């Protein structure tokens, strides 16, 4: 059986957590393939809020196996903290021995470099994700499997500190001594060793046994290292194809690809955001949508739906359908805008240029509606809400197959 993919196709924070949690109830295995604890996903179940960063959303399904793949960078401190929320995780959670370790000094490097950039800072979460991926690519990083031999790992990290002493000195970063470091690594080993394994073989076996598998993306397509709004991007591949490299499976193993989008747009940090709205409307969207970052708590920038960007991301990911999230946040607006094209250097364009800094949105307006909260049947949606969805389908050429009308799991429309 093929593995289905959930992927964000805006700038992250699209609401993937709710959809993965809802769908995970019918899957045997849920996998993360990239990112780190810079990517938060929020799930609401029976009025209770769960904020996860590394552990897949399938953890709330007691029957599902959850896999953190080789493409993820894992902070032992953070995953141990997350794991403490749950009981009986052995046999339900597995971490790739090839996933790279995101250690405390990586975050210090990240934060120091951002400070040095001043007003040219990217706006990272400061969690050390970039430095960890940089070490992975330069072949100087450390992997989860090395935690199983903490004495050797300690020596290797101390040698790394020695070789990079000039960098740590310039950035004014102090490093732990041998005793401190070894104690830290021994604690990690004690708490994490039962979960570290060869996850590629685990996923292959599940595929061969026709298990139902869901691949959960983190962040969003517009933050992809290659295809996003570079350099204001993350350090990993956030598109559906990244699921293959991040788990060790081949493209033929991929099934249905669902792109997750908000009914409007948000972005955290710096970088181009064509439809950002600085008026009262943008402020209202942020307040009603409670648009604050799961990881950083930072206020998200808010704006109207960018159909040009979504069309680009849908094609890039090969989306079979879209899941439209937070439609209820637009309740009560008299007019709702949709970006249908851009203006660049005085010309109208219908594609995403490599440099988004100078594009201006071209909008169409749609009449608003009163409320969609709690509606679970497409036919019961207000007429104008249906028109809004149809406009998105028309421009993106992708069917909106799932519609969320409140944070609750049950308040979701599934279209046949």
Swiss-Prot record:
EC number: 6.3.4.4
GO biological process entries: 'de novo' AMP biosynthetic process; IMP metabolic process
Name used for this protein in its record: Adenylosuccinate synthetase
Name of the gene: purA
Cofactor note: Binds 1 Mg(2+) ion per subunit.
Keywords for the protein's UniProt record, in alphabetical order: Cytoplasm, GTP-binding, Ligase, Magnesium, Metal-binding, Nucleotide-binding, Purine biosynthesis
GO cellular component term, pick one: cytoplasm
Origin: domain of life: Bacteria
InterPro entries the UniProt entry points to: Adenylosuccin_syn_GTP-bd, Adenylosuccin_syn_Lys_AS, Adenylosuccinate_synth_dom1, Adenylosuccinate_synth_dom2, Adenylosuccinate_synth_dom3, Adenylosuccinate_synthetase, P-loop_NTPase
Binding positions for Mg(2+) per the UniProt entry: 13, 40
The keyword Glycosyltransferase is assigned to this record: no
Chain sites annotated for binding GTP: 12-18, 40-42, 300, 326-328, 404-406
PANTHER family found in the cross-reference section: ADENYLOSUCCINATE SYNTHETASE
Matching PROSITE patterns: ADENYLOSUCCIN_SYN_1 (PS01266), ADENYLOSUCCIN_SYN_2 (PS00513)
Catalytic activity: IMP + L-aspartate + GTP = N(6)-(1,2-dicarboxyethyl)-AMP + GDP + phosphate + 2 H(+)
Enzymatic class: ligase
Keyword Magnesium: yes
GO molecular function, one term: magnesium ion binding
The protein's assembly and partners: Homodimer.
């Amino acid at each position: 059986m093929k593995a289905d993919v959930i992927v964000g196709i805006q700038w992250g924070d699209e609401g993937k957590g709710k959809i993965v949690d809802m769908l995970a109830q019918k899957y045997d295995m849920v996998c993360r393939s990239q990112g780190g604890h810079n990517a938060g996903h929020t799930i609401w179940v029976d009025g209770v809020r769960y904020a996860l960063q590394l552990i897949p959303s399938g953890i709330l399904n007691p029957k599902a196996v959850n896999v953190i793949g080789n493409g993820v960078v894992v902070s032992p401190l953070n995953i141990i903290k997350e794991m403490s929320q749950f009981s009986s995780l052995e046999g339900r959670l597995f971490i790739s021995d090839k996933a790279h370790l995101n250690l405390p000094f990586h975050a210090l490097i990240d934060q120091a470099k951002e400070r040095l950039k001043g007003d040219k800072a990217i706006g990272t979460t400061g969690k050390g994700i970039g430095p960890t991926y940089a070490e992975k690519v330069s072949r100087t990083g450390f992997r989860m499997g090395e935690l199983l031999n903490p004495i050797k790992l300690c020596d290797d990290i101390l040698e790394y500190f020695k070789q990079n002493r000039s960098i740590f000195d310039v950035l004014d970063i102090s490093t732990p001594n041998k005793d401190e470091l070894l104690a830290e690594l021994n604690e990690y080993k004690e708490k994490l060793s039962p979960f570290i394994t060869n996850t590629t073989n685990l996923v292959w076996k599940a595929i061969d046994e026709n298990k139902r598998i869901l691949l959960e993306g983190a962040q969003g397509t517009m933050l992809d290292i290659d295809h996003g709004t570079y350099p204001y991007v993350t350090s990993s591949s956030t598109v559906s194809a990244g699921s293959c490299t991040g788990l060790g499976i081949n493209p033929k193993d991929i099934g249905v690809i669902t792109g997750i989008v908000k009914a409007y747009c948000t972005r955290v940090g710096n970088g181009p955001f064509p439809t950002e709205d600085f008026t009262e409307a943008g402020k209202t969207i942020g307040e009603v949508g409670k648009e604050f970052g799961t990881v950083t708590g930072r206020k998200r920038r808010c704006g109207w739906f960018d159909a040009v960007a979504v069309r680009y991301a849908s094609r890039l990911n090969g989306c079979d359908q879209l899941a439209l999230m937070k439609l209820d946040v637009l309740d009560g607006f008299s007019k709702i805008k949709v970006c249908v094209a851009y203006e660049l250097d005085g010309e109208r364009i219908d594609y995403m240029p490599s440099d988004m800094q100078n594009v201006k949105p071209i909008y169409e307006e749609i009449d608003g509606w009163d409320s969609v909260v709690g509606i679970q049947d497409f036919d019961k949606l207000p007429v104008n809400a249906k028109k809004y969805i149809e406009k998105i389908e028309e421009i993106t050429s992708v069917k909106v197959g799932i519609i969320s009308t409140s944070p609750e799991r049950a308040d979701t429309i599934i279209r046949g």
